[in-house]
């Protein structure tokens, strides 16, 4: 059996989900400025179900409501490894979790356009799917995507998603 220090270290490691090049961590108040910038960029939100413009107060209210959400449905900040530092590039999460049918919807926004087309979306979605099945014990993870969002469709297919239907 490990020491209490081992337990503390293990808990700290589990609070962040690490991939090869990305990590998913809790959203912090200082992230709100970047999120506000991204959700008001029509190029970033083109494939998302967001409506422009969004005030900074709206974004702060969104952040303040996170404390009341089911911990399993809190969004995660996406960061990429840049040597000795981590760079915030977007957010993702699990939502509309159905405990009876053990399913949930996934969502992602890579807001930093300088980090587009580098495969981070597929890596993030793979981590989220693994988290859904191994940690949350779900049977099904799904998402919705606009058919014209080709970059996202490719990313989701790389992560193992298959087309079930079109609306």
Q: How would you label these PLM feature ranges?
A:
Residues 2-114:
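GNAT-family acyltransferases
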Residues 27, 131-133, 161:
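Conserved hydrophobic/aromatic "anchor" residues
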Residues 34, 105, 123, 140, ...:
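Amphipathic alpha-helical recognition patches that constitute DNA-binding helices
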Residues 86, 119, 149:
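Conserved G/P- and acidic residue-centered "switch" motifs that form tight phosphate/ATP-binding loops
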Residues 113, 143-153:
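Conserved beta-strand-loop-alpha-helix junction that forms the acyl-donor binding cleft
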Residues 134-144:
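Conserved GNAT acetyl-CoA-binding A-motif
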Residues 142-145, 162-167:
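Conserved catalytic-core motifs of GNAT/GCN5-like acyltransferases
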């Amino acid at each position: 059996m490990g020491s209490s220090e081992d337990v503390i270290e293990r808990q700290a490691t589990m609070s962040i989900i690490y991939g090869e090049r990305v990590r998913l961590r809790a959203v912090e108040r200082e992230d709100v400025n970047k999120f506000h910038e991204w959700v008001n960029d029509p190029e970033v939100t083109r494939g998302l179900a967001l409506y422009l413009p969004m005030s900074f107060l709206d974004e702060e209210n969104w952040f303040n409501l996170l404390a009341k959400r089911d911990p399993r449905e809190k969004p995660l900040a996406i960061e990429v490894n840049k040597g000795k530092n981590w760079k915030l590039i977007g957010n993702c999460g699990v939502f509309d979790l159905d405990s009876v049918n053990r399913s949930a919807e996934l969502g992602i926004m890579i807001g930093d356009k300088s980090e587009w087309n580098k495969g981070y979306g597929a890596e993030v979605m793979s981590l989220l799917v693994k988290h859904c099945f191994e940690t949350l014990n779900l049977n099904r993870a799904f998402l919705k995507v606009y058919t014209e969002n080709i970059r996202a469709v490719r990313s989701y297919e790389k992560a193992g998603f298959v087309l079930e239907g079109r609306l």
